[in-house]
């Protein structure tokens, strides 16, 4: 079981200070790499449809998956034809790019990809090479906008809009890896189109074995439960359950962990509540104690207004370019 080092989220720490020279070196490498793309020394794949990148500059969960679900479905509801590309982290398929379906195996395409596909009404392709994923998507589906899930640092994929998500831990101690949680310097946020705070709303709690069996949130008050989370920021999940009144026995696992039945061998009969990403990998277990806690992204109205105005203009501009207008 792994979690982010505590010193990443402390303003001052001995270990953070010791590692700061390595962070400085890391920043230099990141800036050089990005600069090579900016001046054309490394190739950027460009496409005839808008590419919207959703990501973050920190290691760990920032609510990307619920946000991408909301964005894909909202685009579809507004008459667009979205598609999603992702790395498919944790997937071990022999062939990529690979189209994700509702019946895809998380072991093959990754847990986040399977969760996304079960909750969005649009095509999705996974591949470590994001450009190859977009080519495969556009070759096989008629999409007019592509969402790049967790692609902020993948500069080989051209982009028209960038959305950076920030979670409740913000930027931690403000240092880059390994002294802090930042993948890129915090100044990177000045270059994206939107910075959106992570906000999740509880949706429902249902039993994995029988999804029709649900627990009302009021029933959680004073109830002792095992909370199991193999996500980037498990503390946020535990805090949500505590806010609803539950007495939480926390079990943080490493991100993208694949569970075994013995992981749930607790010496009591308390309910076991999982995140949606974890539940995807536990449906094969015949255990009536297993429940899933589903959430929805809450997105600011101002972002919605600005984003859909911009994306509409970009689509019209690209269409005019294709037609030579």
UniProtKB/Swiss-Prot annotation:
EC number: 2.7.1.130
Binding site for ATP: 58-65
Biological pathway: Glycolipid biosynthesis; lipid IV(A) biosynthesis; lipid IV(A) from (3R)-3-hydroxytetradecanoyl-[acyl-carrier-protein] and UDP-N-acetyl-alpha-D-glucosamine: step 6/6
InterPro entries in alphabetical order: LpxK, P-loop_NTPase
Pfam families recorded: LpxK
Keyword Iron-sulfur part of the UniProt annotation: no
Record CDD domains: SIMIBI
GO molecular function terms listed in the Swiss-Prot or TrEMBL record: ATP binding; tetraacyldisaccharide 4'-kinase activity
Entry keywords, A to Z: ATP-binding, Kinase, Lipid A biosynthesis, Lipid biosynthesis, Lipid metabolism, Nucleotide-binding, Transferase
GO cellular component, one term: plasma membrane
Reaction catalyzed: a lipid A disaccharide + ATP = a lipid IVA + ADP + H(+)
GO biological process: lipid A biosynthetic process; lipopolysaccharide core region biosynthetic process
Matching SUPFAM superfamilies: P-loop containing nucleoside triphosphate hydrolases (SSF52540)
Family: Belongs to the LpxK family.
HAMAP family according to UniProt: LpxK
Reported function: Transfers the gamma-phosphate of ATP to the 4'-position of a tetraacyldisaccharide 1-phosphate intermediate (termed DS-1-P) to form tetraacyldisaccharide 1,4'-bis-phosphate (lipid IVA).
Name of the protein this chain belongs to: Tetraacyldisaccharide 4'-kinase
């Amino acid at each position: 079981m792994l979690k982010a080092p505590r010193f990443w989220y402390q303003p001052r720490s001995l270990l953070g200070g010791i590692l700061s020279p390595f962070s400085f070196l890391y920043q230099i490498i990141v800036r050089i790499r990005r600069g090579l793309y900016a001046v054309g020394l490394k190739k950027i794949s460009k496409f005839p449809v808008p590419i919207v990148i959703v990501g973050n500059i920190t290691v760990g969960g920032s609510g990307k998956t619920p946000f991408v679900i909301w964005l894909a479905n909202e685009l579809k509801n507004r008459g667009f034809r979205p598609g999603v590309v992702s790395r498919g982290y944790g997937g071990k398929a022999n062939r990529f790019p690979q189209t994700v379906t509702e019946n895809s195996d998380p072991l093959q395409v990754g847990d986040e990809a399977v969760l996304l596909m079960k909750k969005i009404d649009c095509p999705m392709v996974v591949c470590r090479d994001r450009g190859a994923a977009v080519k495969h998507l556009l070759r096989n589906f008629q999409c007019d906008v592509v969402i790049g899930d967790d692609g902020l640092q993948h500069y080989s994929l051209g982009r028209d809009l960038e959305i950076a998500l920030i979670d409740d831990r913000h930027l931690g101690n403000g240092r880059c890896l390994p002294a802090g949680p930042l993948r890129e310097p915090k100044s990177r946020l000045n270059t994206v189109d939107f910075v959106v705070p992570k906000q999740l709303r509880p949706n429902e709690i249902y039993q994995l074995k029988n999804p029709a069996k649900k627990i009302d949130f009021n029933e959680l008050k004073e109830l002792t439960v095992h909370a199991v989370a193999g996500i980037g920021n498990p503390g946020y999940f535990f805090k949500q359950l505590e806010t609803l009144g539950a007495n939480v026995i926390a079990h943080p696992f490493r991100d993208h962990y694949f569970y075994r039945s013995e992981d749930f061998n607790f010496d009591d009969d308390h309910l076991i509540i999982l995140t949606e990403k974890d539940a995807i990998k536990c449906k094969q277990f015949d255990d009536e104690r297993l429940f899933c806690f589903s959430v929805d992204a809450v997105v600011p109205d101002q972002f919605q207004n600005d984003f859909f105005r911009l994306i509409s203009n970009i689509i019209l501009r690209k269409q005019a370019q294709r037609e030579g207008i």
